[in-house]
């Protein structure tokens, strides 16, 4: 979470397994120093090429936030979908198989790998919203459209996964219990 007027980092949340603690620590240090998303993009960290990349997910989060601040990427939040004008073109750029498993109402399926083949079918003057699973392919589709003269394009922040969790009935979210391992690889019990 960052302040849109200056990019100051206000908070962070990470969901995952391996390396989450390391990355939250990196983010906490930037927040403690009153840092910005620009600091995230420039953050240096130790890494070994066989085990991680030169650009950490924390750096990538900084790049995404910088693109939003610098207007290189326009996003829309899931709450705003209901307020879109009726003539908005809504495109789900996931694969056909992913789309069949579920989609956001009124979104048509044009996989990102096929988008260039359909550019002449899309009206350049109408607003367009793109989505994918979590945002990366949506960003790629956004760039394809903008670079081909489409002016009113936005990418759904967090993609289909964020929308599906945000709009799911609370009972459905609460009833989903993750599996908790009973022991670690060291034979230590995790359940007391």
Residue ranges and their predicted role:
Residues 1, 191-192:
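Generic low-polarity alpha-helical segments
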Residues 1-40:
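C-terminal catalytic lobe of FAD-dependent flavoproteins
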